Amino acid sequence: MEYTTLGNTGATVSRLALGCMSFGSEHEWMLDEEEGRELIERAIDLGITFFDTANVYSNGESESILGDVLGEYDRDRFTVATKVYGEMDETNPNSGGLSRKAIEQELANSLDRLGMETIDLYQIHRWDDETPIEETLAALDDAVRRGKVRYLGASSMWAHQFAAALHASEREGYDRFVTMQNLYNLAYREEEREMVPLCEREGIGMLPWSPVGAGYLARPYEQDDATVRGEHETALGRPYREGGGEEINRRVEELAEEKGVEMAQIALRWVAGKDVVDAPIVGTSSVDHLEDAVEALDIDLSDSDVEWLEAPYEPVRVSGHE
């Protein structure tokens, strides 16, 4: 396993993060506690030290499963990231959003489910139009100062919103975001227009989610919805098939055959090879696929390979935070 620093901090993380959205019971393709344990333990064996979850994943089940397993190890070995924003209780109007009240109560709940005293990376899951960003940043800064959170991150939003948040942090003297978790893969590169340059300029580490397009770049074009998870992603209307998406898929397939590897490994290696990317978030329900993901880091993609893979891309609809 390769390791890197998180954003412009000194914290060391593995070059892949295990995404834990698949833990729980919200959808039929998800993993129960026993299956989740097997995946987490194998990730640890492979050298993965970075785990990403969220309070809304199966309404807290994901955090609980992750916390139960990591609680049996030396906590200091791992970097645990979770998120806040989504509604957790429809009877409680303050269980979602990014108000001070919501952040304080949901942070406490996440710490309890994870069985931890401190969260390494606390991320805002989306932008909250209903709450002044200064209120959100003040609450997050308080969490850092109280020792409940070590670092702050953001996820899927417009670049102008992220820039406003960074500026407000500097103006008010608040702890600033060090990471951006956004939708980014070979078939969806709209982030390169504004978000990627912003992150590069500000020293923000990117943690791309869906680096293989929830399977779109892991199987031939005609088999896009061949799995239950693939059908779920197709139903969300991701624009992977738009623009040059079909040709990109076919080129990933061709290069994978040429190199004797899996399509998903080519797609993942492309993402991991971007300088602005610290660690792609690998979400999988299979130990075999997890092992493939780790092996993907050793694949050699030449400059000409990268140029050839990228060439068919055309602008598509903005997705991930619409």
Language model feature labels by segment:
Residues 111-130:
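Active-site groove signature of glycoside hydrolases
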Residues 30-43, 98-114, 162-166:
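Short, acidic/polar
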